[in-house]
Amino acid sequence: MYTAKEVILSQIKPALGCTEPAAIALNGAYLKEYVKNAKKIQLTINTNLMKNAMYVPIPNTGKKFGVKLAFALGYLCGDKTKGLNVFENIDKKCIEEAEKYINKIELDIVEGREIYIKSEAEGCEVITKKFHDYISSIKTSEKVITFESKNIDNNISDTEKWLKKISFDTLYRLIEKEKDFDFVKNAVDVNFELSKIGLNSDCGLNIGKSYKGDDIFSKIVSITVSASDARMEGVNYPAMSLVGSGNHGISAILPVWVYGKEKNFQENEIFKAVALSMLITIYIKLFIGRLSAICGAAFASGCGVAGGIAYLESNNKEVSKKAVSYVIQDINGVICDGAKMACSLKVRLGAKSGYEAAMFALEGKPVFSDGILENDITKSIQNLSRVSEAMYNVDGSIVEIMKNKII
């Protein structure tokens, strides 16, 4: 049995910009340690990773993007000790060098939904697997090194296996056993700072700024989406990522926190509800997949927001579960067509659906076990896993469309 704190801390970490380009760059930074100034590099990534790395702006580049560019920046200028903040020190000179270097990189796309990156040069091979910052092996002409990178919790796999075996109700027991929720404070602070950047400057699509009302819903959407606007712009400030995604962290954390602050709940109560939202998001993501055809920033985090806000107001797990069920019925089929600045629109959708679902549940509106919804919410989420698997061909079609435009 793991604690709520252990589960959450295993799944959060700061990440600068979108995590897929960062993962690619980090792989390049590791390759540089063994092969410098390679005349040719063979880069292989899986389809879903490519989908989320192709068109999203890279931090500190002035909105430049591209899979090869991300790798070249990491290979030429990246610091592997920075982990998913690998783009932190990118400057103009590095960008110019990287743009020239991309002609030396050959890119191959292979089928697969699980994170996979392999770079090869002059007899050296670096492989990233399963997690964005997990360098699983490094092979040189002299030796093979298999190891856990410093940026990954060795117990993540065991934690995830355990989570997929427990019931949804167990999440509430984990939350109730925790007494002090200060461990989520840093995540709230980091993402709120990112939101302030989005609110105070022109970032991404500037969707967050469109919500100017003083009502609680407008404030939730404005603050949450502004953080995503800033992140997808590629500003030089990290998001606190959740389950490998900055937008998941933003959209699971900020709506619940804003709601609690606006309603004047005690800080520990708010952090408790935020922790529940994060747990629900993690739980659902493990069933639909880290990289899938379903947009987790809208759907999984939306479920977390609904459950967190409803629990904060009612302190009743049945009301909270009902709220989650509303989101399942509302937006369960929203697709992910790759990371880009427009992702802030889907973050908006998750915040909206989560907030409204919580209100419906608190008003006592009925929930019916139709469609993919079951009387047992654990089974409903297992059904979502089946839907996600069945959408593999949908995902493939999206990736094929994007491959025809590949840069």
Curated annotation (Swiss-Prot):
State the Gene Ontology BP annotations. Answer: L-cysteine catabolic process to pyruvate
Its domain of life reads Bacteria
Which InterPro entries does the entry link to?
Ser_deHydtase-like_asu, UPF0597
Pfam short name (any one): SDH_alpha
In alphabetical order, the GO MF annotations are:
L-cysteine desulfhydrase activity
Q: Return the similarity comment.
A: Belongs to the UPF0597 family.
Give the matching HAMAP family.
UPF0597 (MF_01845)
Q: What is this protein called?
A: UPF0597 protein NAMH_0191
Q: Which organism is this protein's natural source?
A: Nautilia profundicola (strain ATCC BAA-1463 / DSM 18972 / AmH)
